[in-house]
Amino acid sequence: MTVSETESAVPVDASAYREAMSRLASAVHLITTDGPGGRAGFTASAVCSVSDAPPTLLVCINRAASAYAPLIRNGTLCVNTLGGGHETVAGLFGGRTPMDERFAAGTWRRLRSGAPALTDALVSFDCRIVERHAVGSHDVLYCAVEAVAAAGQADALLYSERRYRTLPRAPRGGSAPAEPARGARAIGARPPEGPVLALRSA
């Protein structure tokens, strides 16, 4: 066994892993659901695209989260990607605030699934959960996108180094800022209406 193999066999400390992950800048989303299991939602950064044929998103949720049981029972969700003015609602959905108070902080509409879609989100992806896998403390959800609603141009909300930050949008018809790191503005320390495009079900 080589030295490198020996070192790689040592488990990574969970706190060291969390510290390393805190250095990544991620988009911020509200994951919402409604249905037989009740209305619920939480703030998430563990969201990514899987495929565009068919359109599919991946969403991760801790099984200890208060939104977990309603989300799984409903089988549907809406991924609401937040803009720079949404740090307050992101903080509410990311803490221990009661569900009714979380939803009172925003204005909502319904798309295809019935899950609440934030009217001024940068974009909302209305989804149906098609696969679920348990990995460690979380469930990994594969979600078929059935409708998309975009609110237009706005700054993006990011989460990096345990702070919310804004990423200014690129000028219309132009390129992104030459130094996006300097353009990003820290706006908080807590872990934030347009046409609807219907997609065919997967």
UniProtKB/Swiss-Prot annotation:
Lineage, highest ranks first: Bacteria, Pseudomonadati, Pseudomonadota, Alphaproteobacteria, Hyphomicrobiales
Q: Does the keyword Ion transport apply?
A: no
Check the record and name the Pfam families matching this protein: Flavin_Reduct (PF01613)
Task: List the catalytic activities from the record.
Answer: FMNH2 + NAD(+) = FMN + NADH + 2 H(+)
- SUPFAM superfamilies linked: FMN-binding split barrel
**Enzyme Commission code(s) on record:** 1.5.1.42
Please provide, alphabetically and separated by semicolons, the GO molecular function terms listed in this UniProt record: FMN binding; FMN reductase (NADH) activity; FMN reductase [NAD(P)H] activity; riboflavin reductase (NADPH) activity
What family is reported?
Belongs to the non-flavoprotein flavin reductase family. RutF subfamily.
The source's domain of life comes to Bacteria
Q: Which GO terms describe its biological process?
A: nitrogen utilization; uracil catabolic process
**Spans of biased composition, class Low complexity?**
168-191
Protein name, per record:
FMN reductase (NADH) RutF
What function does the entry list?
Answer: Catalyzes the reduction of FMN to FMNH2 which is used to reduce pyrimidine by RutA via the Rut pathway.
Provide the residue span(s) of the region labelled Disordered: 168-202
The alphabetical list of record keywords is: Flavoprotein, FMN, NAD, Oxidoreductase
Q: Which organism is it from?
A: Methylorubrum populi (strain ATCC BAA-705 / NCIMB 13946 / BJ001) (Methylobacterium populi)
